[in-house]
Amino acid sequence: DDIINVAGHRLSTGAIEEVLAEHKSVAECAVIGIADKLKGQIPIGLLALKAGVKQKNEEIIKECIAMVREKVGPVAAFKIAIVVKRLPKTRSGKVLRGTVRKIADNETYKMPATIDDPAILDEIKADLIENKILKL
């Protein structure tokens, strides 16, 4: 699992993902570290919700941020999460965290040959722009 460096602290994205996955409305999630001028990297959560969730996205995000703060600690600096329709994966089911990180950091990336559905990357990019994470 990935290790990100947040203000000199090494954090496991997997540990944050475990906490997010405990939320009753989250079907699956991914955490990536994106570049930050002040802290080096900051964690961003991508949340795919369970079908039929009635709770507002803002409430789910707020609860997820509080859960990470409580269980991982304030050192995680986890303050940003977005709700996405689905996560980009390989045909074998592995989440393409590296590709998503490159998109979020506005770096060039290659379309992975093993991607399950290439259209997902455009969806993720649109979500990142809409949530002001990716600034073009």
Task: Describe these PLM feature segments.
Residues 1-76, 86, 91-95, 99-102, ...:
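AMP-binding/adenylate-forming catalytic core of the ANL superfamily
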Residues 81-84:
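General small-molecule cofactor/ligand-binding pocket signal
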Residues 102-108:
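Short arginine-rich
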Residues 123-136:
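A cross-kingdom feature marking charged/low-complexity
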